[in-house]
Swiss-Prot record:
Its EC number is 3.1.1.73. The gene is faeC. One of its GO terms (cellular component) is extracellular region. Belongs to the faeC family. This is Probable feruloyl esterase C. GO terms for biological process: xylan catabolic process. Involved in degradation of plant cell walls. Hydrolyzes the feruloyl-arabinose ester bond in arabinoxylans, and the feruloyl-galactose ester bond in pectin. Active against paranitrophenyl-acetate, methyl ferulate and wheat arabinoxylan. Residues 1-21 form the signal peptide. Its main location: secreted. It is an enzyme of class 3 (hydrolase). It catalyses: feruloyl-polysaccharide + H2O = ferulate + polysaccharide. Keywords: Carbohydrate metabolism, Glycoprotein, Hydrolase, Polysaccharide degradation, Secreted, Serine esterase, Signal, Xylan degradation. GO terms for molecular function: feruloyl esterase activity.
Length: 270
């Protein structure tokens, strides 16, 4: 079983185009994939195609990864966060969004099975829909942040950027040596995945990207504010936002634009 998963992942990965690639094979086709739940083997994901979808226009591809105890519907419906982490509204029809379902309400990524799932979804979606293959992104909170970090490690050549909200090394880090645009957002009083660990994740990709070392600033306790640190001299951008809060799916409160605005701006500038 394990060998089968690994072999399937290698075969799918060999068909994926890097962030330096062109448009997907789905461009110009009449699509067959529709909004809603889709299956790959024994796994599921929810797909959201813009209402104004144009098969001749390449779209961004954005993965929204749920937290521990959540599921794909939590991301789509906006449980404790804006729907789709606030990115659907900011994309204004320019992105196709995917919310995969983790196994056992999480992303243990055992033997790389969750990375393999993402690979398979990319292939299925891009074979049918028009995607700019240089414009794939992933974001998630908590375990979803950990899974986004795992994708940064294992699929830096396939994704342009990730935004890790209150993440940790909880889905592994296969590879982890290639540069990728990396945004970390973390509460200074996080009791679940400590703030310093979030800084360590960002520092890893700052090193991969050849950035100058930087002091990561923090807001005052009780200030209800945030401090953004942009690393300098990087081959690919690295930023870290420290906010006054704990382990929060929506930093500074549901409806606060901090994380959605920062993530969208970072993705588009990456």
């Amino acid at each position: 079983m394990i060998k089968s998963i690994i072999l399937q992942a290698i075969m799918v990965l060999s068909t994926l185009t890097s962030v330096h690639g062109a448009n997907s094979s789905g461009c110009g086709k009449q699509p067959t994939l529709v909004n809603g739940v889709h299956k790959i083997n024994d796994r599921e994901y929810i797909l959201k195609v813009p209402d104004n979808y144009n098969a001749n226009k390449p779209h961004h591809l954005i993965f929204g990864l749920h937290w521990r105890g959540g599921n794909m519907n939590s991301v789509v419906n906006g449980e404790s966060v804006e729907p789709w982490y606030g990115l659907e509204t900011r994309a204004q029809g320019s992105a196709i969004l995917v919310a995969p379902n983790g196994r056992n309400a999480g992303w243990a990524n055992t033997n790389g099975e969750d990375v393999a799932l993402i690979d398979a979804i990319i292939k299925q979606v891009e074979d049918d829909l028009c995607i700019d293959q240089s414009s794939r992104f992933a974001t998630g909170f908590s375990w979803g942040g950990g899974m986004s970090y795992a994708l940064a490690c294992a699929r830096a050549k396939e994704f342009r950027a990730v935004s890790v909200l209150s993440g940790g090394v909880i889905s592994g880090c296969e590879g982890g040596h290639d540069p990728i645009a990396y945004l970390g957002i973390h509460g200074i009083s996080d009791p679940v995945l400590p703030f310093d660990g979030g800084v360590t994740l960002a520092n890893k990709f700052a090193a991969n990207n050849g950035c100058q070392q930087a002091y990561v600033g923090k807001p005052g306790l009780g200030s209800h504010s945030s401090v953004q640190t942009d690393f300098k001299g990087c081959s690919r951008p690295v930023s870290f936002i420290a906010y006054d809060g704990g382990h929060d799916a929506a930093p500074l409160g549901v409806g606060n634009p901090l994380a959605p605005d920062a993530t969208w701006k970072f993705f588009m500038a990456a």
